[in-house]
Each structure stands twice: as C-alpha cells, then as structure tokens.
Curated annotation (Swiss-Prot):
Gene3D superfamilies: Urease, beta subunit
Pfam name, any one: Urease_beta
Family indicated by similarity: Belongs to the urease beta subunit family.
Descriptive protein name: Urease subunit beta
Origin species: Allorhizobium ampelinum (strain ATCC BAA-846 / DSM 112012 / S4)
Pathway, per record: Nitrogen metabolism; urea degradation; CO(2) and NH(3) from urea (urease route): step 1/1
Enzyme class: hydrolase
Cellular-component GO terms for this entry: urease complex
Lineage of source species: Bacteria, Pseudomonadati, Pseudomonadota, Alphaproteobacteria, Hyphomicrobiales
C-alpha cells in the first residue's frame, strides 16, 4: 500500500439503498443554464426551474455526492430525488425553510 492509496472492496456499491424515491419532470424556463448539486435542497432551487415544489420539500437529487445535474435553457428532464437525511433541518440555501422539515 502507498500513502493515500485507497483499495476499494470488490463488487458493486448501491448508492442510497432502501431510500424512498420521487421522480419528477423539471423544466428550465430561464435563459441561463442552472446546475444543482447533489445535496442541495431541491425545493429551494433556482426559480427558473419549473416543477411541483411542494412534492419535493425535504428532498435532494439521487446522484453521487459531489456531482451535479445541469439544466440547459428550455430543457426538460426527469430527475429522481431522495429525502434529506440526518436531523432533517434545513438552513441557508434560499432561506425558504430555515428550520425543521
């Protein structure tokens, strides 16, 4: 082993196993691209993204940590979301919640 080397276990790793999911259709109605990170509270994303916000309160994208999804102007795509974990308190972002979910 070398310093800093990571030796991963063999086999497949299933991300967010057992988490309930919600799949929604999202449209970018703006004139600029919008990028949403893996742990961003999806309910509070850019107002130019059109979708049922009430349906996704307390949820984030079901993608690997540190990655993001980009929505080009005029683009519509399906995304899958999972619940935020931990204490289920949201602070910051666009300040739409600022407390427990």
């Amino acid at each position: 082993m070398k310093p800093g080397e990571i030796i991963a276990a063999s086999g497949e790793i299933e991300l967010n196993a057992g988490q309930p999911t919600v799949t929604i259709e999202v449209s970018n109605t703006g004139d600029r691209p919008v990028q949403v990170g893996s742990h961003y509270h999806f309910f509070e994303t850019n107002a130019g993204l059109s979708f049922d916000r009430d349906k996704v309160r307390g949820m984030r994208l079901d993608i690997p940590a540190g990655t993001a999804v980009r929505f080009e102007p005029g683009q519509t795509r399906e995304v899958t979301l999972i619940p935020l974990a931990g204490k289920r308190e949201v602070y910051g972002f666009r300040q739409k919640v600022m407390g427990p979910l």
